[in-house]
Amino acid sequence: IFDEKSADGIVGAVDLEQYDYRKGSGSAVRATEATVAERIPPRLKVRRGAPLELPHIMILIDDPQKTVIEKVSAKKASLKKLYDFTLMKNGGSIKGYLMDGETVAETDSALAALGNSEEFEKKYGKGTPVLLYAMGDGNHSLATAKEYYEELKRENPDKDFSNHPARYALA
């Protein structure tokens, strides 16, 4: 939902195991434009020493039936409000709500349906890999997060990274 006065969305974690920014990628999470590899090393240098990372990543979904974001937005009144404040410099205001277990399950189910390969192929052609999450903004930030995560795995081959915080990026 977007107009001049409001924009609804979902803040969540992206599994970097599902992301590939390289040209020709068929991963479920991928870039919509070329990633300039030369931009990654300077960002990676900053990321290595950062006590906190606050990325600006916007991911888009193709959801013409409005089964994901709009369904969550319709439930706002029943969700716990986490924050509600005015932004500086006439930036408007922002509110955030905590999705309850039922809403998370419904959202996961709706996203899984969007990732159905048969439905995706009907729309985009046979053999087209499902693009569930398209990078809208912050592609280089996400690519840097991916490189940092891959670097950690290379440096610690015996470590279990299945639940490591570096495996996920805020988007």
Which residue stretches match the model-derived regions?
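N-terminal extension/subdomain marker
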Residues: 1-91, 119-123
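Short, well-ordered loop/turn elements at secondary-structure boundaries
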Residues: 52-55, 127-131, 164-167
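A short alpha->loop->secondary-structure connector
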Residues: 77, 153-161
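Glycine-rich phosphate-binding "P-loop"
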Residues: 88-109
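Active-site beta-strand/loop microenvironment that shapes enzyme catalytic pockets
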Residues: 113-155
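Class I SAM-dependent methyltransferase SAM-binding "motif I" and its flanking Rossmann-like core
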Residues: 159-171
